[in-house]
Amino acid sequence: MAAGEISTPQEYISHHLHHLQVGTGFWSINVDSMFFSIALGILFLVIFHRVAKRATSGVPGKLQTAVELLIGFVDGTVRDMFHGKSKLIAPLALTIFVWVFLMNMMDLLPIDLLPQLWAGVYSLLGYDPAHAYLRAVPTADVNITLSMALGVFILVLFYSIKMKGLGGFVKELTMQPFNHPVFIPINLILEGVSLLSKPISLGLRLFGNMYAGELIFILIAGLLPWWSQWLLNVPWAIFHILIITLQAFIFMVLTVVYLSMASEEH
């Protein structure tokens, strides 16, 4: 962001809440969210691939030790919560936790750092830097969090049908909680709402927490003079580290719980 182009706190806040977009309306794509989420996913894969490739049976390095501790923690969590048998759940849980954590961590970067760099590039390309929009926290974009939740929802449906069969899955939707044919419409509504509420709440919970955290940083930067911002930024950043980690953990745990519920025979 070019500071000289933004004259009021309202314009500053509005500018920082605007995505770099392609298209308009419903079909618009938030390019910044897509870029950072994909880039951080690639970063996760590169780091873990290098650690796995260089893993030794001797004294491990600091990075290998950290990765092994993380893998052990996630594996133990999955064993406690997922009672079925699947070799994919633990890797999925690890991927979700690390990926969401990395995307959340973008909220700890100085609020003007990446927007100002992008504004400089935008200006060099001959465009007005006042229109160089950029948001760096993918999980503060509801499209990203709901897309991830949709992926979890598809996996829940897959495991439900795989473990119970299509007939068993349909029976679960139509014959619970009232086990009588006359209550099929009511059962279908109740079970349908319960099923759909899982991905919606999963995505909105992560989005709401990260959007609120990002907004607080923006408000501090937009409303306070620069010399006093650190008085609020530092304590909030320290507290926000807990939120960042906790939200990644909650997203992972709920994913495992939903898949465990889908895998259980009723």
From Swiss-Prot:
GO terms for biological process: proton motive force-driven plasma membrane ATP synthesis. One of its GO terms (cellular component) is proton-transporting ATP synthase complex. It is a multi-pass membrane protein. The keyword Transcription regulation does not apply. InterPro entries: ATP_syn_F0_a_bact/chloroplast, ATP_synth_F0_asu, ATP_synth_F0_asu_AS, F0_ATP_A_sf. It comes from the Bacteria. It is found in: Cell inner membrane. One of its GO terms (molecular function) is proton-transporting ATP synthase activity, rotational mechanism. Keywords: ATP synthesis, Cell inner membrane, Cell membrane, CF(0), Hydrogen ion transport, Ion transport, Membrane, Transmembrane, Transmembrane helix, Transport. The chain crosses the membrane at residues 28-48, 88-108, 141-161, 206-226, 237-257. Its main location: membrane. The keyword Transcription does not apply. Key component of the proton channel; it plays a direct role in the translocation of protons across the membrane. Belongs to the ATPase A chain family. F-type ATPases have 2 components, CF(1) - the catalytic core - and CF(0) - the membrane proton channel. CF(1) has five subunits: alpha(3), beta(3), gamma(1), delta(1), epsilon(1). CF(0) has three main subunits: a(1), b(2) and c(9-12). The alpha and beta chains form an alternating ring which encloses part of the gamma chain. CF(1) is attached to CF(0) by a central stalk formed by the gamma and epsilon chains, while a peripheral stalk is formed by the delta and b chains. This is ATP synthase subunit a. It comes from Pectobacterium atrosepticum (strain SCRI 1043 / ATCC BAA-672).
